[in-house]
Amino acid sequence: MERRDFFKKALTVAGTAAVGSTTTEAAQTVHPVDNRKVSDIAFPQKRPLITYSDRPPLLESPREVFTSALTPNDLFFVRWHLPIIPTYINPRKFSVKVDGAVKNEIKISLHTLKTEFKAVEVTAVLQCGGNSRTAFKPTTSGIQWGVGAMGCAKWKGVRLKDVLQKAGLADGATWVGFNGEEKAVYNETSDFIREIKIAEIHDDIILAYEMNGEDLPYLNGYPLRLVLPGVYSDSWIKMLSHITVTKERQKLHFMDHAYRIPDNDCECETPDNLAAKTKPIEEMNVNSLIGYPQTGTKVKQGAELIVRGIAFDGGHGIKTVQISIDSGATWNDAKLDDGSQGKYAYRAFSYKLKLTESGTLSILCKASNEKGEEQPFPQDIKWNHGGYKYNGIDKVTVEVVA
């Protein structure tokens, strides 16, 4: 299929069918994932995923995906914010514009990015700030994601630094904003624009055109997206087409009112006493997840069960992953992979369990990082109105049968 015609196909095959059919029992698999069902209708370039919406596309990866350091492209979650996505993209004509407080306003074609700039790779976790939002009680606003609004990929592209150097920064340039091709239905609705400080730009921030050795999947931002390793995905702008450099921070809806948490020591509030002062969500918390087994898995008494999963943080580095089978009274170290994918990537882990007794068995995992941070128990996580940055100790419950 031509990439530029992708979404016409998607709207026909997935859009009209997914929402119209996945509400019926016949259109869902019997494959529960944390009490959620994977649709049996797949979007193009994707295997069946947990579907929340087709416009904009909101697709969650099933728990079973999280057993290796890299997430396959066709199982990678999808999160768009605005409902209108181009149905036609011609890669030969696509370009990204750089303007604002620069010495030279420029437009750089996709071809030029690929042929005239140094190509670099970075492996990094992409995670929605609202991942696992459904765990917050009372329920918060936003998509009620389960555990799978995240993935890890090897991204290839060009350094943001190099693109800005090509344009040349004007004196006093302080901020840089990013806008993509997703649009709202009404003109009054703000574009989804995110900003970062120029002083915080480092070599691992790239404009990516490849994901796991292939062109970006259409639903993951083809043909170009911003990659900001270590921070939540709200700023990883998809279908990136416009970069604006400014001397002052702009007034932007999606910076001023969205993806923000209480600006206090606990980053917390209560439904009856919302925080007056807030700050953007940025660096990811230390986190881990069991990919296998899953809740409801049946295993044979006397067998050896290998627990597998992943751990990550905002780039400080995972130090340990530990497993408990006694509700957290005691913990044992899992085996971590060699970490060769880099500090922003998943660390895959494994742990061998000998199943000596039949019955229900709960398995917990928690990660710690080199900064000294450790996952808390779910009951110790403080509430915030957006349901952001959840990183509670993970648990699955299996049945050991004689």
What are these model-predicted stretches?
Residues 2-96, 102-108, 117-119, 165-402:
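Extended, aromatic/histidine-rich regions of cofactor-dependent oxidoreductases associated
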Residues 98, 127, 159-163:
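Generic beta-strand or strand-like secondary-structure segments
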Residues 99-103, 111, 129-131:
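Acidic/polar N-terminal loop/beta-strand segments that form early-domain functional surfaces
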Residues 111-114, 140-144, 175-176:
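"Short basic amphipathic alpha-helical interaction patches in structured regions
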Residues 121-152:
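Short, conserved helix/loop micro-motifs enriched in His/Cys and acidic residues
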Residues 155-162, 197:
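Short, structural beta-strand-to-alpha-helix junction motif
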